[in-house]
Amino acid sequence: MSFDSVPRHALSMRFDLEPPSHASAAHRVAVLLVNLGTPDAPTPRAVRRYLAQFLSDPRVVEIPQLVWQVILCTLILPLRGRASAKKYAAVWLPEGSPLRVYTERQVESVKPLFAANGYRVIVDYAMRYGTPSIADVLAQLKRAGAERVLLLPMYPQYSSSTTATAFDAAFAALGRMRNQPEVRTVRHYADHPAYIHALAEQVRQYWAAHGRPAFDAGDKLVLSFHGVPKRTLDLGDPYHDQCQQTAALLMSALGLTTFECRVTFQSRFGKAEWLQPYTAPTLKELGAAGVRRADVFCPGFTADCLETIEEIGIEVRDEFVHGGGKEFHRIPCLNASPAWIAALGEIAAENLQGWPVRVAMAPEAVS
């Protein structure tokens, strides 16, 4: 039966048109890594298109949409589109957006870790905003024969504005499918031992290559998480507590105290109060207080992006130096580090239990 022969009224139905279903014993399994998203190009037009989608999400901006859309379209997009495009252009890689490049490397690095009794575990990625969209990739996975999908957000700490909205988009796509795959979700892994180990290894390896801060002389390690409005904490979002939990476990793994290590929150947007202390003012204060060296690491970002490369590496660095600091280090995110790839495989394996697939670790892939 050709889709061309289907009556037009059938194409306007609520559910997506699908080919006839055939019984299969394969039960192919897919692991879908989900990240926030990125513009397709470092141009004002592409950035405005991306920001319009991102900032129109009611889980991201929780104010009445009629009021917000007027502000967004008349003030924010015209002003921020061009300014943000310049920032993206400064960090753009030859292969494309840093977030997309590092996410693709994560996918390609994780694939060798999965094997299953004659079946292959499909590993792919999608973005909540921009391309490739969650809906498009779920449709591709279905066409590839995936009957079971594990949604694995690249957000270690749960938040309504990140994890929940990614699940919203996935379930909305499923809601348009007549023949839905079975789906599981990973809510968070803020305290997962493999994730904490990967963070600690990333810091240790950076220090092995660039020298360890002189903590006895007052140097500091700053753990900077993405901020959210403080009212979300008051409304019951667990994000703040999970960030603090991750930070405490990482400090313990590194053998550091709260005197040597600070926890801050970055990327504040708008005039409302967000989670504090804020990253940039904290670094400026540290510089003014005579701290010679500050290392900044972003545990909540699993891949480097505009917020880590430009905001931390340039803007926050300048605040520290202008405050009087002498030596600033931005420790790269987990990206495709061997310890993080092994952790992704372990987290996925735990959440695939009970499905007809066995997850095997390939030693050569994590050595």
Curated annotation (Swiss-Prot):
Keywords: Cytoplasm, Heme biosynthesis, Iron, Lyase, Metal-binding, Porphyrin biosynthesis
Keyword match Cytoplasm: yes
Pathway note: Porphyrin-containing compound metabolism; protoheme biosynthesis; protoheme from protoporphyrin-IX: step 1/1
Chief site of localization: cytoplasm
Coiled-coil stretches noted in the UniProt entry, renumbered to this chain: none
GO molecular function, one term: ferrochelatase activity
PROSITE patterns, alphabetized: FERROCHELATASE (PS00534)
Cited NCBIfam families: hemH
Name listed for the protein in its UniProt record: Ferrochelatase
Annotated source species: Burkholderia mallei (strain ATCC 23344)
Gene: hemH
